[in-house]
């Protein structure tokens, strides 16, 4: 496993980290098995969040007895000092630790970032927690290029997390700026939220960029971990065949697709929006029509039940035309 220094933090971390979203689908014992497998294979960076339901709690159980071998990162959507201070304490309790290596401001659009930095904003609590030894370093995660640009100019920002993958490389210049400013860059959504099926090619693409400090694919089992390890540990140049695969993936996905971040939820009509688009993808792109239709049939609310309120679109960090996409999905499923 290759190791990198995470920017200004000085922390030595593995080139591949562990994305903590998918462990919401397993259990505490399964998480413990994964943590020990990470340790065996030299993966020492773990990412989670207050908003990932039971992820922090499962990781707290899974890391018992081996916490000191890992660089632990979490994040909070809180924007005020009071709320952030509470979240930091909850994270410490959930993770069963007395310190967190990196605490991040989670998905702050430009207006929210201004609130964070204002008097009484979340930055005050983060700074106080750092001074008290509760957290080691402060970072930010974003889905907006404007937020990324703003974060690059903030002296307290030690790391930036942003989507980077085969079909989303708009931030390449900003990622390079991170390297120039000694800001650690954490590549999230290397598989575009599951839209890219070929995990090996996807991870090989991300790791081919020397400005990426760490990539954090989500993993829910040891088979996924082993596959990802094989991809990241392969340091050979990208082949002609791999480049061709990447072009095909770009052509198939374009830019208008769901990354399954679920920031659009809750839907006013009760539709599981990301599930609709997941099954629609399998129907349209991957030739699994029967499976996609059978899974879609299990949804309690179908795409055709969209009431057109637009609340989801106002929350989508990718500005997707969700209402029209739901209409298209409904038509494909014969509604």
Predicted feature locations:
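A general structural detector for well-ordered alpha-helical segments in enzyme core domains, enriched
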Residues: 2, 34-35, 58-62, 87-91, ...
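Glycine/proline-rich, positively charged
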Residues: 26-29, 36, 40, 79-186, ...
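Structured C-terminal cap/extension of enzyme domains
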Residues: 39, 43, 173-187, 191-335
